Swiss-Prot record:
The lineage of its organism: Eukaryota, Metazoa, Echinodermata, Eleutherozoa, Asterozoa. Residues 38-81 are annotated as: Disordered. The gene is WNT-1. Keywords: Developmental protein, Disulfide bond, Extracellular matrix, Glycoprotein, Lipoprotein, Secreted, Wnt signaling pathway. Residues 46-60 have a biased composition (Basic and acidic residues). Glycans are attached at residues 110-111. GO terms for biological process: canonical Wnt signaling pathway; cell fate commitment; neuron differentiation. A lipid is attached at residue 1 (O-palmitoleoyl serine). It is found in: Secreted, Extracellular space, Extracellular matrix; Secreted. The keyword Transferase does not apply. It comes from Evasterias troschelii (Mottled sea star). Disulfide bonds join 109-124. GO terms for cellular component: extracellular space. This is Protein Wnt-1.
């Protein structure tokens, strides 16, 4: 009796949730950096389209090596898989027309929610006015 078992292996994408959790973890550990100018060679008037071979920013493994240094000198330099940023995000809690944020003052929030619509998060730690609304309706109930 000859039975044949065939196994096929293929790559598959991780679940959306696991990708989101991974990115959120990296986001929470992101490092603020400044760009070092040392080690960059070539004509700075060429703009972004200059020949990469002249810029001196290739690493030994053929990848691009960014010249990032920690914004705070007490912090360690970011690794090749770390998320980095140059500027802090604007404070979305306060109105800032230049950044295009309206702030959260005067917005409705849900006092019982722990999500983004919850008062604790939306009001940015400030106090908030509570109100209760009662609506009386005819229900056409039968007993």
């Amino acid at each position: 009796s000859g039975t044949c078992t065939i196994e096929t292996c293929w790559m598959r994408l991780p679940t959306f949730r696991s990708v989101g959790e991974f990115l959120k973890d990296r986001f929470d550990g992101a490092s603020r950096v400044a760009l070092r100018n040392e080690g960059v060679r070539g004509n700075s008037n060429r703009g972004d389209r200059g020949d990469r071979r002249d810029r001196g920013d290739r690493s030994d493994n053929g990848g691009t090596e960014a010249n990032f240094q920690p914004y705070n000198s007490n912090h360690k330099p970011p690794g090749p898989r770390d998320l980095v940023y140059f500027d802090d995000s604007p404070d979305f809690c306060v109105r800032n027309e230049r950044a295009g944020t309206l702030g959260t003052v005067g917005r409705e929030c849900n006092n019982t929610s722990l999500g983004v619509d919850g008062c604790d998060l939306m009001c940015c730690g400030r106090d908030y006015d509570g109100s209760e609304v009662r609506i009386k309706e005819r229900c056409s109930c039968t007993f």
